């Protein structure tokens, strides 16, 4: 798209924090008109993006109610990760790095709701965005726009957790919870890349079939029997699959009862990776009030007796605290993508006008 081809567009706006994401979707988010961008207003190092695709992530949902640890200031446009075409560039942008017409993905750690500073309000649920050239990266030819906007957040999280923190290596077995979600599938991909055996869990046979098709060696449905609460006992299956030894690594993005049962599935000295708590999304109060009324708790007796390393894995916070950890991680992920060794899974595609349907689908676990 050239600058002269641009027309007025649309953007989604979160007007204020809600009590929970569903309330935000229903009452505090709207699709608003967006003026035709004027390339003449770009600063020297800025890039104008004609957005083609934006992913809907779990974090996007939690941010709308102020229940994520980082809270953008409303009003803002959601959409942590997005991709598009370069429509115009500022006078100081190096054409060797990015040029008009390039297919690019935008770094959600530098711009958009998860960032700090001048570009925080400009998320990807919009027709256009203006970003600094340092936040723009050419999309590998192996990926579509839809796939590209599902790359960095998912695979950087999985890399930080499994490889940097978990020290997963060839020959080990990893138990991956929430494997049918976008970050869980990325974890399956990376675990197989390093040569590990993957036991993946989920609550839907259909979704677990997809996880198996993406490389998991074994899958376990943890849904409790009809009429029962929590999760069903799966320690015996894991022990059987590991010759009675248990797994060396647990990748836990679910929390709650899954975490407790997983403590019975580990080998002595295993690494237990805390990635998230999808089973208890209201771990913080709504409307940005903080607090932890539903905090997950792990029994310290089992942690001690099994000699576990319990590791918190906040990819973004760790990167902010030590930016040097990111360049090698970023380069490796981009190289794997360019080589066709990792390909993000896209389960659903919606037009921007159906953003509420897309966000409800994510909340209800209807897609990856």
Task: Show which residues each predicted segment covers.
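NAD(P)H dinucleotide-binding glycine-rich loop of Rossmann-like/cofactor-binding domains
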Residues: 106-178
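Short, well-ordered loop/turn sites that connect or cap secondary structure elements
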Residues: 97-99, 168, 266
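C-terminal hydrophobic helical "lid"/dimerization subdomain
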Residues: 1-7, 321-368
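Adenosine-nucleotide cofactor-binding segment
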Residues: 176, 192-261
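Hydrophobic/small residue at the entry helix of a nucleotide-binding pocket
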Residues: 157, 182-183, 257-258
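N-terminal Rossmann NAD(P)H-binding glycine-rich loop of SDR-like oxidoreductase domains
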Residues: 180, 188
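Glycine-rich beta-strand-centered segment in the early N-terminal region that forms part
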Residues: 37-56, 67-113, 140-143, 253
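Glycine-rich phosphate-binding loop and adjacent beta-alpha segment
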Residues: 194, 257-342
